[in-house]
Each structure stands twice: as structure tokens, then as C-alpha cells.
């Protein structure tokens, strides 16, 4: 089961206290439900509402703050003149007061953006980081050596202002491929950005808005739990709406925690959590040039150091990381371009989690399954076919498929089911921007895996026909 935990951020529309249809200027129509609105947070975040964050149930509580919830972290987002039009915040900075254990996960695209190449190098030579700078507007991908030099100059400038080493400043970019960052505008905005840093909820909210592009909602979440009897916090923010396909998606993410963990262990934990979350979402089958998740651990909670991946404290922290990243990942799929609902695929009965996850990802990625969900068609044949071509062997006479709680196929045989009820289930999910749950069993193994996607609508084509990637 999952709990819907809205993150409260203001939007710049008067008298909005119920579900509405919002249409950003210049965008084609996309309908969604606004789950939570507030009316008086700082101006920098007054542009788009926040996504509902569907975090798994567990021994944690959701708290305000996003990336600033954990001890030692500050953040802010401002308008720096980087976007092609409008004055939505487009430049964000997240900092840590101390040297934080640093980890990163990146795109598998061979045309990796300049900031991706830079971050990989920085993490190779430094175990720690102090800051993450994120810009929206230009991807700085396929920009050659000039684009890489832009990254170095930006990192040098931030490092000088914060009095840290260049390699302790990590950089993420999102926007139009082939365009270098507007370096002069960015550099001119940095003094204001650094001077505006805050540990407040508002700082986290403004940063989450600043990193968005075609997103209609910002994605930010934080939880509090206990490790060894000590309270620790894990927070995060992410962006993504299109070009969402494993590995990761066109997505950027920053994760923070105040747990104390050795860097080598932290990096293994972060990659595991990414594999269970951002690598399990899909919107359109495209893999971006800029995918990046940076995760920082300040160690300021007072918890004992985690030095082994197999110890109890590591297992507890891993569960918290998984919860935060899965919540953010699902909000990205929920916000898929043109989408009317989230699709969650759960697969059981394989020999391992990895095999189950691969089948789940195959089904969630299927354009035919996505189109059937949008058409409110309970087409179990498309689900079975997508499971079958995932590349994981199973006996088809073990195949079992449910749509919600409606059994469509069992023991590899189609069943007589209430088709109007199944169609209504899909229709209700679309009308409320809810979740369509597909359950698949392929055998008697203990492996369980999940993947998330969204339906495929006419609006997806319209949005991407009108937007320069």
C-alpha cells in the first residue's frame, strides 16, 4: 500500500482551493488534479504546484523540507535569466555545511552532456562534495569542449564563493540539447543565488521549482526515521516529465541525508536505490543525455557510522533511500507529458528481484499497454505479450494477470471477467489522475519487482511536436 503525501508549495493563481485544470502558457492542454495548495510561500516558488508523492508505507514519517530537511543542508532557487521565455526560477543551488559523502548515478547515453562528464570526473577524484548547482534552459549536451569549459568556469566560480574545492561542486543541467548554458547570465546570478541560501522549507521548494522544464508539478519530499535509535532524515527533489526511460529518464535529482555513512558504502546504497526507482520508470522510451542523481550524506544526525553494506543500520537507511527515490520516481511518471494516470506494474514469482523488475519494466514501457490504458481498454493480451518479450524465461502456463483486483488471466488461460467493470477501473484512474495497478505472477519464485509508467495520450505527441528538445 502507498500513502499520498502532498508537499505544500504555493502557486500563482488566485482562489485555487480545489481540483483544477491548469494550462501553462504555450503548452497544449494537460489535465491533472491539484492535491494540495497553500497561499503564501515565498515568491520564487509561486509558479507551479507540487506533485503528490506516493511513498511506500514503512517506519518513517513524511516531514516538510525536501532537500533541506536533513541537518546541514541549504537550498534556493531563483530566476537567473536562463530560460527562453518567462521568469520561472531556472537556477538552483543545494549546499552542505560540511564535507558530505557524495554519490552519483548518470545517464547511459553515449552523448553524455558536459555536466555529466564533469560530475563523473569530480566524483572519481573526490569522496566528498559541498554543493550541487542546477540550471534549467540549456542542456549543455553535444556542445563539445566549449560546453565543458563552461562547466569548469561555473564550478570554479561557485567554489570560490563557497570557499571549497572545485571538485566539491557538482553541476546538473536540463533544457535544450545542443545549446550551451547562458554562462554570462548564470555567473551574474551566482552572488544572489549564494546569498539567498536557506535551510527553510521555502528554500527547498524554490529549488524544486527551479529545476523543472516541461514538468507541470515540482517534486520534493522528505522523511524522518530512526537508525540505531537515532532520528535521521532523508530528503530529495527531482524533475522529469518527458524523455523518461530507463536507465533513469530525462531526470535530475538531488538526495540529501544526515545519516553518517562511509562513501564507498553510500555509493553502493545510492545505486541500489536508483535501480529500484529512477531506473524503473518510463514515459516515452527516450533516454536523455543529462540524467543525473547526486546524493549527499552530511553525517550530522549523530547516528553511528555505517561502514558495511550488510549491517542493520545500512539496511534501515537503504529502506529510507528506496522510499524517497521511489516516491520521486513515481511522481515523475505521474507527471508524464500528456498523461492522465500513473501505471504501476508489480511482477512476482521470478528467481530474483532483478528478473521481476525487468519484466515489470517491459510491461510499463509498452506503448501498446500505455495506449490501451488511455483508451480504457482492459487488453490483457498486450500485457501478456510485453511480459513475454522481456527476455526473462518463464512457463506461460504459470502466467497470472490482474488489473486492480480484477483477475484477467490465470494459469496461462484467459478468464471470463467483467469487462465493463475493468473499463470503469481504468476510466476512474484517468478521470482522477490516479493509479492503474497491474499485477503479474509468472511462477513460484520469491523475486518481486516493480516499475512505473503512464498512459500514452494524443497530448504527448502534441506537446513534443511543439517543444524543441
From Swiss-Prot:
Keywords associated with the record: Acyltransferase, Amino-acid biosynthesis, Arginine biosynthesis, Autocatalytic cleavage, Chloroplast, Multifunctional enzyme, Plastid, Transferase
GO process terms (BP): L-arginine biosynthetic process; ornithine biosynthetic process
Site (Involved in the stabilization of negative charge on the oxyanion by the formation of the oxyanion hole): 174-175
E.C. numbers: 2.3.1.35, 2.3.1.1
Functional pathway: Amino-acid biosynthesis; L-arginine biosynthesis; L-ornithine and N-acetyl-L-glutamate from L-glutamate and N(2)-acetyl-L-ornithine (cyclic): step 1/1; Amino-acid biosynthesis; L-arginine biosynthesis; N(2)-acetyl-L-ornithine from L-glutamate: step 1/4
Site positions (Cleavage): 249-250
Compartments where located: Plastid, Chloroplast
Chloroplast keyword on record: yes
InterPro entries assigned: Arg_biosynth_ArgJ, ArgJ-like_dom_sf, ArgJ_beta_C
Gene Ontology CC entries for this record: chloroplast
Root EC class: transferase
Residue numbers binding substrate: 213, 239, 250, 337, 464, 469
Coiled coil: none
UniProt GO molecular function: glutamate N-acetyltransferase activity; L-glutamate N-acetyltransferase activity
Active-site feature positions: 250
Transferase among keywords: yes
Reaction catalysis annotation: N(2)-acetyl-L-ornithine + L-glutamate = N-acetyl-L-glutamate + L-ornithine; L-glutamate + acetyl-CoA = N-acetyl-L-glutamate + CoA + H(+)
Pfam family, one: ArgJ
Task of the protein: Catalyzes two activities which are involved in the cyclic version of arginine biosynthesis: the synthesis of acetylglutamate from glutamate and acetyl-CoA, and of ornithine by transacetylation between acetylornithine and glutamate.
Record-stated family: Belongs to the ArgJ family.
Subunit-structure text: Heterodimer of an alpha and a beta chain.
Misc remark: This protein may be expected to contain an N-terminal transit peptide but none has been predicted.
NCBIfam families cross-referenced by the UniProt entry: ArgJ (TIGR00120), PRK05388.1 (NF003802)
Protein name, UniProt field: Arginine biosynthesis bifunctional protein ArgJ, chloroplastic
Amino acid at each position: 500500500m502507498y500513502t499520498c503525501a502532498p508537499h505544500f508549495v504555493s502557486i500563482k493563481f488566485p482562489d485555487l482551493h480545489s481540483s483544477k485544470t491548469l494550462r501553462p502558457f504555450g503548452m497544449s492542454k494537460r489535465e491533472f488534479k491539484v492535491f494540495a495548495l497553500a497561499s503564501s510561500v515565498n515568491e520564487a516558488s509561486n509558479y507551479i504546484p507540487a506533485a503528490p508523492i506516493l511513498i511506500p508505507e514503512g517506519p518513517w514519517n513524511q516531514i516538510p523540507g525536501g532537500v533541506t530537511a536533513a541537518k546541514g543542508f541549504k537550498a534556493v532557487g531563483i530566476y537567473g535569466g536562463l530560460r527562453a521565455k518567462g521568469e520561472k526560477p531556472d537556477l538552483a543551488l543545494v549546499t552542505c555545511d560540511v564535507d558530505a559523502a557524495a554519490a552519483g548515478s548518470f545517464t547511459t547515453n553515449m552523448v553524455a552532456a558536459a555536466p555529466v562528464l564533469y560530475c563523473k570526473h569530480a566524483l572519481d577524484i573526490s569522496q566528498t562534495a559541498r554543493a550541487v548547482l542546477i540550471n534549467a534552459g540549456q542542456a549543455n549536451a553535444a556542445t563539445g569542449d566549449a560546453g565543458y569549459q563552461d562547466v569548469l568556469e561555473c564550478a570554479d566560480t561557485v567554489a570560490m564563493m563557497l570557499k571549497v574545492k572545485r571538485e566539491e561542486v557538482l553541476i546538473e543541467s536540463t533544457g535544450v540539447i545542443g545549446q550551451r548554458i547562458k554562462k554570462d547570465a548564470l555567473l551574474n546570478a551566482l552572488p544572489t543565488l549564494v546569498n539567498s541560501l536557506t535551510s527553510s522549507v521555502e528554500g527547498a521548494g524554490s529549488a524544486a521549482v527551479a529545476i523543472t522544464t516541461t514538468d507541470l508539478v515540482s517534486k520534493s519530499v522528505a522523511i524522518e526515521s530512526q537508525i540505531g535509535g537515532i532520528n535521521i532524515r532523508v530528503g530529495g527533489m527531482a524533475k522529469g516529465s518527458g524523455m523518461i526511460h530507463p536507465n533513469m529518464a530525462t531526470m535530475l535529482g538531488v538526495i540529501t541525508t544526515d545519516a553518517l555513512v562511509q562513501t564507498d558504502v553510500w555509493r553502493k546504497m545510492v545505486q541500489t536505490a536508483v535501480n529500484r526507482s529512477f531506473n524503473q520508470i518510463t514515459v516515452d522510451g527516450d533516454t536523455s543525455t543529462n540524467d543525473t542523481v547526486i546524493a549527499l550524506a552530511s553525517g550530522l544526525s549523530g547516528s553511528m557510522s555505517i561502514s558495511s553494506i550488510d549491517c542493520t543500520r545500512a539496511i534501515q537507511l537503504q529502506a529510507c533511500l528506496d522510499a524517497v527515490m521511489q516516491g520521486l520516481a513515481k511522481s515523475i511518471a505521474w507527471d508524464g507529458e500528456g498523461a492522465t494516470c500513473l501505471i504501476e506494474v508489480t511482477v512476482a514469482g521470478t528467481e530474483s528481484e532483478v528478473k521481476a523488475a525487468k519484466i515489470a519494466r517491459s510491461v510499463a514501457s509498452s506503448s501498446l499497454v500505455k495506449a490501451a490504458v488511455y483508451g480504457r481498454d482492459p487488453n490483457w493480451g498486450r500485457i501478456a505479450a510485453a511480459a513475454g518479450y522481456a527476455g526473462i524465461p518463464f512457463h506461460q502456463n504459470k502466467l497470472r494477470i490482474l488489473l486492480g483486483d480484477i483477475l484477467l488471466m490465470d494459469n496461462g488461460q484467459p478468464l471470463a471477467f467483467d469487462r465493463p467493470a475493468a473499463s470503469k477501473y481504468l476510466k476512474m484512474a484517468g478521470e482522477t489522475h490516479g493509479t492503474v495497478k497491474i499485477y503479474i505472477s509468472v511462477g513460484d519464485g520469491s523475486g518481486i519487482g516493480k516499475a512505473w509508467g503512464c498512459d500514452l495520450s494524443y497530448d504527448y505527441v502534441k506537446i513534443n511536436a511543439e517543444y524543441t528538445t
